[in-house]
A protein has these predicted regions:
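Transmembrane beta-barrel domains of Gram-negative outer membranes and organellar outer membranes
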Residues: 1-104, 108-127, 138, 147-154, ...
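Short helix-loop boundary/capping segments
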Residues: 131-137
C-alpha cells in the first residue's frame, strides 16, 4: 500500500483516502535470476521485471568487493483510452503508447553486517511523451543505503536523480526514507516518499510530490 500526501489534511484523512495498491509476485528462478510481475491501482498499471546478478560480493579471502546486477522492467497502463493523461480524440490510441521500459545497473556493497550502500544508474524509455521537446529516454543516477539500528529494526533510503532538462519543471526527483521492522517471520515496512507510483517509469519520471510542501 502507498497512501496519499499528508498535506491533504483532514479532508483527505492525511493521505489515507488516497491509497494506491500494488499486488506483486516475485520468484527466484536461480540464486542469480529473479523475475516478477505486479498490478498497481495507480493508472491501472501492469508491470514486470527480470533481475540477473552477474557478480556477488564475497567475504574475506576473495577479491570481489561488490555485487553487480542488471534489472530490466516494463510497465503497461490499462486505463480506458478516455482516461489516459494524453488522450486526444483526434489521435489514434496505439497499444505501444501505453508501454514504458526501464534498465538499471545495480552496484552494491555491504560494508558490514549493519551497513549497505548501492548505486544504480539507469535509463527509462517512454514510447509516448507529452510534447515533441520531451525526450523519450530519461537518464538517472540513483542510489540507496540501509543501516541496521538493532537486530530487528533498520532504516533505509533511496534517491533517484534525473539529469537536468529531461522532465518538465513540475516533476520532482523521487526521495524515499523508511524503516524495516522484523517480527518473527514477517518484515513490516513503513516508508515515506514523494512518489505515488510503485513502478520505475512512474516514480522516476512522473513524481509530482514535494518534500518541502
Amino acid at each position: 500500500h502507498r497512501f496519499g500526501f499528508v498535506n491533504g489534511g483532514a479532508n483527505e484523512f492525511f493521505g489515507l483516502d488516497g491509497a494506491t495498491i500494488r499486488l506483486g509476485l516475485d520468484y527466484g528462478v536461480t540464486d542469480r535470476l529473479m523475475i516478477g510481475a505486479g498490478r498497481s491501482s495507480f493508472q491501472k498499471t501492469v508491470d514486470g521485471f527480470a533481475k540477473y546478478k552477474f557478480l556477488k560480493q564475497c567475504d574475506a579471502g576473495c577479491t570481489m568487493p561488490v555485487t553487480l546486477a542488471l534489472v530490466a522492467s516494463t510497465s503497461l497502463t490499462t486505463l480506458k483510452k478516455e482516461q489516459l493523461p494524453w488522450y486526444d480524440p483526434a489521435n489514434v490510441d496505439y497499444f505501444s503508447h501505453r508501454l514504458g521500459y526501464s534498465f538499471q545497473v545495480i552496484v552494491g556493497r555491504k560494508f558490514s553486517d549493519r551497513f549497505t550502500v548501492q548505486l544504480n544508474p539507469g535509463v527509462v524509455h517512454r514510447n509516448l511523451v507529452t510534447t515533441v521537446d520531451d525526450p523519450n529516454d530519461v537518464v538517472h543516477i540513483s542510489g540507496g543505503a540501509r543501516m541496521k539500528l538493532s537486530k530487528r529494526v533498520a532504516i533505509n533510503g533511496e534517491y533517484f536523480h534525473v539529469l537536468r532538462d529531461q522532465l518538465p519543471i513540475n516533476y520532482r526527483n523521487s526521495l524515499s526514507v523508511g524503516f524495516d521492522i522484523e517480527t518473527g517471520g514477517h518484515v513490516f515496512q513503513l516508508h515515506f516518499t514523494n512518489s505515488t507510483a510503485m513502478y520505475e517509469r512512474g516514480f522516476i519520471t512522473e513524481t509530482v510530490g514535494d518534500w518541502t510542501n
